[in-house]
Structure formats: structure tokens, C-alpha cells
Amino acid sequence: MAASVEHDSLESMEAPQTAVEVEETKTFKDLGVTDVLCEACDQLGWTKPTKIQIEAIPLALQGRDIIGLAETGSGKTGAFALPILNALLETPQRLFALVLTPTRELAFQISEQFEALGSSIGVQCAVIVGGIDSMSQSLALAKKPHIVIATPGRLIDHLENTKGFNLRALKYLVMDEADRILNMDFETEVDKILKVIPRDRKTFLFSATMTKKVQKLQRAALKNPVKCAVSSKYQTVEKLQQYYLFIPSKFKDTYLVYILNELAGNSFMIFCSTCNNTQRTALLLRNLGFTAIPLHGQMSQSKRLGSLNKFKAKARSILLATDVASRGLDIPHVDVVVNFDIPTHSKDYIHRVGRTARAGRSGKAITFVTQYDVELFQRIEHLIGKKLPVFPTQDDEVMMLTERVTEAQRFARMELREHGEKKKRSREDVGDNDDTEGAIGVRNKVAGGKMKKRKGR
């Protein structure tokens, strides 16, 4: 009974309690994290805990199951990694924790944080995701790492086919971006995983939004959980300047080029709705001399990580992405987000624009609205509860770009066509093993071949 009372009081006092705690609690040590891990936080430059960490860590250390409602960039990886490492120090054990994530990039990112936090205590992680050779993963699992970070599909694969690998001794399960794991139709995989891990475990479920599917999963997977919410209902950050542009769809490319010129010197993340459009737009911009790189589900794993690292290292200032990339990726500096294709789910708008104006910096988000997108745009405005202003443009200046853009579009189409033919030939020779986010066995090789020649000229 006492536990449920504590739970209720937490729920009811949620907002004021957080405020008080933020005032009082200044360090990870105050939250109950052991000294070794506090030092690791210092080395990573984590001077003080974020809101979600202040709420979740003490409860996790008490052994409670947790539902964390927090957006990307809120420090939620630390909120589950620190309690898990803390517990691992107390009772060292192999195959101690499993973290499920929707995408491979996020899995690698979480693994990096675990390894950085646990470097002084020798924590070993294995990342088990699609698009990477199964055999080497089986070998990594045979060494029985402490932490397994996986996408559900590939993990099931190993649970069924890798001899000697099981999770029967597992102590912690984390589902990060649970809403997205479920939206990507991994429900059956998650159910299978829940069946083969111990009932007697601690479970942390993190999600940016509380959907019906997430509530159902919560009932199936968590015992008497405590809710830690830090994001209020779908708000977008105050320092974010949001605009829209109403334009005929045939002029989208031209307006994009105009905006990139107008706001030159900033880093951009441009969202497209399909892999194909991401690729086409990247080629178009490269033909016009912009340093643009694509990131989407049809690229092989190594290419995706390569793209991401170039952008992170500021070697490229424009990243074009599908929604694959829009959530959970730790991309530190984006000054401007452009919704080149409006998101079909209004909640995705929140996640996309969440790439900018992070950690107290300001940022811009510009959404292109064509004659076909009006209803979707109204839904977005309704969701965030504000009317967006128009981004100011000089239409005569925009129209002066038309000729150059049309020429670049022609080149981009030709390159895509050539690339498509090359791909057909190579697919007959080679089977493809990409399995994340609907990659339909298509590998993008645009970065090679013709593009390189073009630069050399």
C-alpha cells in the first residue's frame, strides 16, 4: 500500500515538486549516483543534471519502474544509463541490461554514452542492429557484454538463431522512443522479446509522446510505474522562431535555394518525406554548389554514419533527411530546420523542429506549405496552439533563380536515372541486407562515381 501512496503523491505533486528539486539539487551526487559515475559525468562535461534526470534517477535508484515522457535533447539517455551502471557496479553481471531503440543511429549513440560513462569501470556494450554483418554480432554476443543495445527486428533474429544467446538473466529493460518503436510496427517483435526475458526485472520506458499504443505497452511491460514528465503538452521551445511559406509546389526547389542563400553561414537540416526526394534534392543542391549530404533509410549503415559524422564535424552545412533522422539523433548544431515536405503526422513537426534551438540557443524553423498541404498545416498550428508568421521573401529575387534551378533539376534527374540503372545491375549481382525503416533493398551509391568526377572538374 505504501508504494501506491507514494506513487499517487508523486503524481499529484509533480509540477511543484520538480520546481523545488531543481532549486535544491545541483549535482549528480545529490541524486544518489556513486562517485565513480559522478566523475565520469564531469569528464563528459555534464555539470548538472537535466530535469528528466533529476526526476527519474532517484526513483530508478530506489528500484521503481519508470515512464519518462521527455523530448529529444532532454538528457534522457543519462536518466536511464546512470541508474543501470550504478546497479551494475553493485551487482556485476553479464547481459545485465537491454536497451531497445527504433533506429540504428540511435543505438550507436546510446552505446557511445554507455561506454563513455562506464569507461573507468570497463563496461562492455554490443550494438545489435540491421545493416551490419550478423556473424560479427553473434561473436560480440558470445562474449556476453554487460549492455545490449538493439533494434527489435535484429535482436529477435539473434534470440532465435544465435546458439547460446539468451536474456534469461536480464535485470533491466529500457525502451527508448517507445512511441516510435511501435509506430514502426515492431509490436510483435517487442511482444516476443517480453516473453523471453525475466518477469522479475526493472523496466524504463521513454517516449516523447504518450500514445494509446504506448499506454498498452506500459500495461504489459511495467509494474506500478512512476511517471516522470518534463515536456508539457506538445510545446515547441520558446527560443525557436517558427515561420511558414505558402508557395506553389512547382517552385519549392527555387524557394529552398533562395532560403539557403539568404541564411548562408548557418547549418541547415532539411526534411523531405521520401528517400527519393531526399536524394534528388541533395543532388540538386550539390549541382548548385551547396555542400549537402543526404541521410535516409535506403543508405547502407556505414554511409549513414559517415553522413552524420561529416555534418557533426561541420564539414558539411546542409543535412537532408527523412523522418528516420528526425528523432533521437544527437546532432549538436542546427541553426535552421526547413520542412521542405510538410510532415503528414503533426506530432512529427514537433520532433523535426526540436533539432534546433537546443540547450538554450535560438533557432529558426521554416515550413513549406503548398496548395496541397493547407489542411496538414492547419493541424500543426492547432497542435502547437499558435499561428505562425510568414517568412519574409523577395519574390522577384526568388524568380531570378528559376533558370539555374531548372537546369540543376535536369541534372539531378539524369543522375538519379543513371544511378537507378546502375543499381538495378548491381542488385542482380548482390543481395541486400538493410532492414531498418522500410529500406526496400536499395543501397545509395550516389556519393561515389559521378559526383566525385564533378568535384574534380
UniProtKB/Swiss-Prot annotation:
Q: Where in this protein does the record say N-acetylalanine is found?
A: A2
Phosphothreonine, modified sites? T151
Which is a Gene Ontology cellular component entry for this protein?
A: nucleus
Per UniProt, ATP binds at A70, E71, T72, G73, S74, G75, K76, T77
Biological process according to GO: extrinsic apoptotic signaling pathway via death domain receptors; mRNA processing; RNA splicing; rRNA processing
Keywords, in A-Z order:
Acetylation, Apoptosis, ATP-binding, Helicase, Hydrolase, mRNA processing, mRNA splicing, Nucleotide-binding, Nucleus, Phosphoprotein, RNA-binding, rRNA processing
* Cited Pfam families: DEAD, Helicase_C
Supply one GO molecular-function term.
ATP hydrolysis activity
Q: Where exactly are the transmembrane stretches of this chain? A: none
Coordinates of motif Q motif in the sequence? 26-54
Determine if Phosphoprotein is one of this entry's keywords: yes
Region described as Disordered: 415-457
Q: Where in the cell is it found?
A: Nucleus, Nucleolus
Q: Which family does it belong to?
A: Belongs to the DEAD box helicase family. DDX47/RRP3 subfamily.
In Swiss-Prot or TrEMBL terms, this protein is called: Probable ATP-dependent RNA helicase DDX47
Record gene name: DDX47
